Amino acid sequence: VEPCSPCPLPNGVAVALTPTGVRLVTNRRGSTVWDVRTAAERYAVKVGRPVPETDEHPGCDWAGVAPAREAVVLQLLETFAVYGTWPYGTWNAQPWHEGPSLYELWEPQRSGEREPSLDAAHACADALAVLHEAGWVHGDIQPAHLIIGPDGTATLIDLALARGGPVPDSVDFPYPGSLVHFESPEISRSLLETGTVAPTSASDVYALGASFFVSATGWRHVDYPDDAPRTVQRKAVATTPHRPVTVPGLFGRLIEAMLSPLPGDRPTSAEVRSVLAHQP
């Protein structure tokens, strides 16, 4: 019996948090996110379930355990998180982060109303550099995972695929790759050739550059049909030059460097942060 969709709020959440209000945020294949308020705090509750294989999509067993893995990662990073199981998978609860994603924040720029906020770009680079300096890689950088808070700082969310610390075997799984729009060529190539790969700080920087590109322009950095199978998408990322970077000035040149096909030619996240710190 497959779980209903959206995944309901598991009983364990009520025991752990005592909710006073609940709102559905997203419901995707393998994951439902709830905005849960308590008398004192606000939490994001993620409920995972395995994704069965279909003619259009490969199966995704790890989606069921991803919330538990993310909670362990957050705990290793000394961030509050709790997790538990439900009949079809696992769930976690973590602090809610208020604010738009980078893509949402830069929407006025894409319509020509104003230039992108390089303060926000700097905040994203700073958050990634701090993660890298702690010995971790994110593995799933994309605009929706870059939240710009009311104070202008950025938070990296969705850390289920992060690597850098001891995750128990009971909640661990091999790195499956990320949203292909933001995979680096070496990640896509390795997944196509061997089926396995490990994310790196350089692949994170590439993904951040691709996130800057699409958030500033509205275009993916590599061109392929929206409905292309994942293998076709990955082949395009691995073999096709990215679209010309039309973002003007030093920021555009920085994005170009971040999207270098050679990992060693990309700036580090700390170097990206330093460049953006000196922009007007």
List PLM regions with ranges.
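Conserved structural core of kinase catalytic domains
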Residues: 82-112
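ATP-binding glycine-rich phosphate-binding loop
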Residues: 2-39
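A conserved short helix/loop substructure at the end of the activation segment
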Residues: 260-271
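Catalytic-loop of the protein kinase fold
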Residues: 132-149
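Activation of the activation-loop gatekeeper triad in protein kinase-fold domains
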Residues: 158-163
